[in-house]
């Protein structure tokens, strides 16, 4: 489920690569989450693909800087929102938990199930709070629970953390 979300954020539908013949090109596309070589400044390595969109799929590919700057929405720089076009063609924000609702629900249920199996109260607390956070895009309480997880031998981090895919504003995770 997390992998599906990452594909959606990085490229879109990965089935175009699954349809490629078995071989190095297909394998490399699957490793790179798309046709761009992450180790070579995102240079395309599959014919027919141009430069990687700077905003990955966090923003509409045709959005201009001026259009984004003029977009008056306090959530536009929130790390847990996507920028999409409404039916009227205007920009709008969409929460991750709405865009990826089906995947988020499955992930949250897996975390809740795992919480019933752990013997560490701090881990259980983190897993339950993170499940709630994924469903609401409010990560503050679960981040505090993560910091309180001092008795675990695992450093368990689940959810949107890194923002390096966002080459436009550097905020979307």
Residues covered by each model-derived region:
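Well-ordered beta-sheet/strand-loop patches within structured domains
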Residues: 53-54, 135, 139-173
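N-terminal helix-rich structural modules
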Residues: 1-130, 142
């Amino acid at each position: 489920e997390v992998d599906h979300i990452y594909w959606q954020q990085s490229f879109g539908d990965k089935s175009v690569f699954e349809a490629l013949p078995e071989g190095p090109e297909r394998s490399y596309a699957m490793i790179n989450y798309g046709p761009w070589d992450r180790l070579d400044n995102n240079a395309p390595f599959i014919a027919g693909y141009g430069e990687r969109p700077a905003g990955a799929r966090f923003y509409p590919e045709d959005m201009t800087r001026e259009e984004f700057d003029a977009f008056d929405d306090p959530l536009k720089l929130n790390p847990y929102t996507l920028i999409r076009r409404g039916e009227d063609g205007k920009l709008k924000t969409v929460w991750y938990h709405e865009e990826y609702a089906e995947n988020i629900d499955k992930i949250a249920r897996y975390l809740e199930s795992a919480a019933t199996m752990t013997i560490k109260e701090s881990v259980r607390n983190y897993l339950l709070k993170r499940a709630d956070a994924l469903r609401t895009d409010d990560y503050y309480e679960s981040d505090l629970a993560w910091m309180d997880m001092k008795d675990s031998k695992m450093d368990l981090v689940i959810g949107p953390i890194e923002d390096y895919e966002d080459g436009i504003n550097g905020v979307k995770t």
